[in-house]
Amino acid sequence: MLHIVKYLEKLPLLSAYLLDGDVVLLTENAIYATAVHSPYRASINDQNLWLVLYEDLHARGWLEKCDPRISVVTMSEFVDLTVTHDKSITW
């Protein structure tokens, strides 16, 4: 399943619903969780693929602050993710 997270405050809830192999894409204000010292960083685990949208990082001046362990994807790649995952949920 593809989990699209737009709001930081939804990250703690998300962990209860994640299954191994699910993909999480951070967008909009949820990109702030990608900072190495973010209090929300603890919500990001190693059992899932965590991605962040480049356009939102760039728009918020957050490119240099993003944890390098989180993969950055473009809008085009985001579209591809929605095509390859038959189920998605937005948080």
Model-derived features: where do they sit?
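Short hydrophobic beta-strand segments
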Residues: M1-K6, D86-T90
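Histidine-anchored nucleotide/phosphate-binding helix
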Residues: I4-L19, V23-V24, Y32, R41
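Short, polar loop motifs at secondary-structure junctions
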Residues: L8-K10, Y54-A59
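Short, well-ordered alpha-helix to beta-strand connector turns
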Residues: D20-G21, Q47, H85-D86
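Short, basic, glycine/proline-bearing loop/turn elements
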Residues: G21-N29, W62-K65
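Short internal beta-strands
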Residues: V23-E28, L49-D56
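N-terminal beta-loop-helix "entrance" segment that forms/cooperates
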Residues: Y32-D46, A59-K65
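C-terminal structural segments of small proteins and small subunits
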Residues: W62-W91
